[in-house]
Amino acid sequence: MNNKFLIASALCMNLGATVNAQNPIIQTQLTADPAPMVDGDTLYVYTGHDEDGADFFWMNEWRVYSTTDMVNWTDYGSPLDLSSFSWADDRAWAAQTIKRNGKYYWYICAHSKLSGGIAIGVAVSDSPTGPFKDALGKPLFDNGQWDNIDPTVWIDDDGQAYLYWGNPHLYYAKLNDGMISLKGGVDPKEAIDDKRQVGRIHMTVDGFGAPDVENRDSTVKYKDNYTEGPWFMKRGKNYYMLYAAGG
């Protein structure tokens, strides 16, 4: 993309609350990858769920919690799991929900039975707490690679929605207005496919703490280099990205 991003690294995201709140805010489930969404006067937090006793990132479902005061939380259980996607069979990892035109779109990543890689899918609902259903009946993006993780979506002021994801590379795509298909038209210098549906944002030390992975010096210890979990926002004329960093 041609925009100049101001980058902020986030080693972790703490959705704790006021001095009266009890931390961790979720104590009855092993949750990961909190993704906040504000709708009206309510904050919703969408999470993954680590299985008890697992020795890897064994995760089969996503969960939803909400609060109106940052102290008291409501647990809505799991309105979305791997069985919601006929093409998925493992690794219900980091995901995000966003509202548009009265509907709620939950962008997820999971292991694909179709390709053997990690694929990105999208579920839709009329309510922020579900029920959600697979919007496509197939992955939104699936190229057989493992690095299609941590999808997030951001909508610019002009209404164009963007999908971001990736580890250790940072990928993006434009979404159509319906939010469930790729629009194409990414910068040809960044496109990774002939249809120009998906682009890769190239990294620099100034922008991301390190150059692209293939250009890194194994003898250099880079600081705060991009790893995964890209979250975009805009304030004034500047675009910001927060991400999970490794050093």
Label each region the model flagged.
Residues M1-Q22:
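Bacterial Sec-dependent N-terminal signal peptides
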Residues N20-G247:
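Carbohydrate-active catalytic/glycan-binding domains of CAZyme proteins
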